[in-house]
Amino acid sequence: MLGGGWRSLGTALVALGAGALLRAGPAQLRAVFLHTEHEQRKSKTVAQANMKVEVLPALTDNYMYLLIDEETKEAAIVDPVQPQKVLDAVKKHGVKLTSVLTTHHHWDHAGGNEKLVKLETGLRVYGGDSRVGALTQKVSHLTSLKVGSLNVKCLCTPCHTSGHICYYVTKPNSSEPPAVFTGDTLFVAGCGKFFEGTPEEMYRALIEILGSLDPETRVYCGHEYTINNLKFARHVEPNNVSIQEKLAWAKAKYDSGEPTIPSTIAEEFTYNPFMRVREKTVQEHAGETDPIRTMGAIRKEKDNFRVPKD
């Protein structure tokens, strides 16, 4: 057991890269080690006629996403913390990787950028923060990018970090659902911690920006936090049937090693307490009548929430 663990640890450290390793703190190294215990997590392909998304588990509970334009076979990678795994997926799909879409600068999202650009030269690296490694173009709110024939709109959603970007992907003249890559702003049934922002900023990010997207938009978030998020959601709204049903579904998926990603914007409004801060049931739980104050109250509660085992 120990020997296998050390071998896996060595593999993990090689995957992370020496530069990122030197910058990593104890918590980061722990996550690199723990990801070896989660290697049974399965990848998943979400295929549409115009775009394909390969869901790539990384580290302990992270997700990377290979976005493929089916028309041109051009691809972008979202948050490539494990570069070799990314390149293996690129080879598997027979596509040309042209760009990196970085949601934010945290090491478990941007920590693989510098190694990836050395392994695959000529990549364009996008992000909304100068702290993003190997950055070639800093983007801002509503900056437009292209991945083959796909349109990518940058949505500035500061709060988790001040330079956080979500990437909204559409295909012109298509009736298929768009996709949005939300990093650590919006999770399934949750949201990111307010490390560099305020409840007002998260309200704007979730309700006014992401919440105004096409309801059928598929949400690809940065972490597999779904079960714990839904347990907190159940605590906030114990009589919400949508939460109960989603939790049972998520447990079954997790037990089989499958991702619970993607959700949709419409679904998030039914079970995500941070998307439901205008609902009376959530406000009553928080003891507030204002949605922004409710956002702050339930985030503070979530930060100290002890997740039940059931």
From Swiss-Prot:
Cofactor: Zn(2+)
Gene of this entry: HAGH
Alphabetical list of Pfam families matching this protein: HAGH_C, Lactamase_B
Function: Thiolesterase that catalyzes the hydrolysis of S-D-lactoyl-glutathione to form glutathione and D-lactic acid.
Positions that bind substrate: K193, F194, F195, H223, E224, Y225, R299, K300, E301, K302
Reactions it catalyzes: an S-(2-hydroxyacyl)glutathione + H2O = a 2-hydroxy carboxylate + glutathione + H(+); (R)-S-lactoylglutathione + H2O = (R)-lactate + glutathione + H(+)
Sequence positions that bind Zn(2+) 2: D108, H109, D184, H223
Subunit architecture: Monomer.
EC number in record: 3.1.2.6
Native organism: Gallus gallus
Alphabetical GO biological process terms: glutathione metabolic process; L-ascorbic acid biosynthetic process; methylglyoxal catabolic process to D-lactate via S-lactoyl-glutathione
Entry's cofactor comment: Binds 2 Zn(2+) ions per subunit.
Annotated GO CC locations: mitochondrial matrix; mitochondrion
Entry's family note: Belongs to the metallo-beta-lactamase superfamily. Glyoxalase II family.
InterPro entries: Clx_II_MBL (IPR035680), HAGH_C (IPR032282), Hydroxyacylglutathione_Hdrlase (IPR017782), Metallo-B-lactamas (IPR001279), RibonucZ/Hydroxyglut_hydro (IPR036866)
Keyword Membrane carried by entry: no
Sorted UniProt keywords: Cytoplasm, Hydrolase, Metal-binding, Mitochondrion, Transit peptide, Zinc
Protein name: Hydroxyacylglutathione hydrolase, mitochondrial
SUPFAM superfamilies xrefs: Metallo-hydrolase/oxidoreductase
Class of enzymatic activity (EC top level): hydrolase
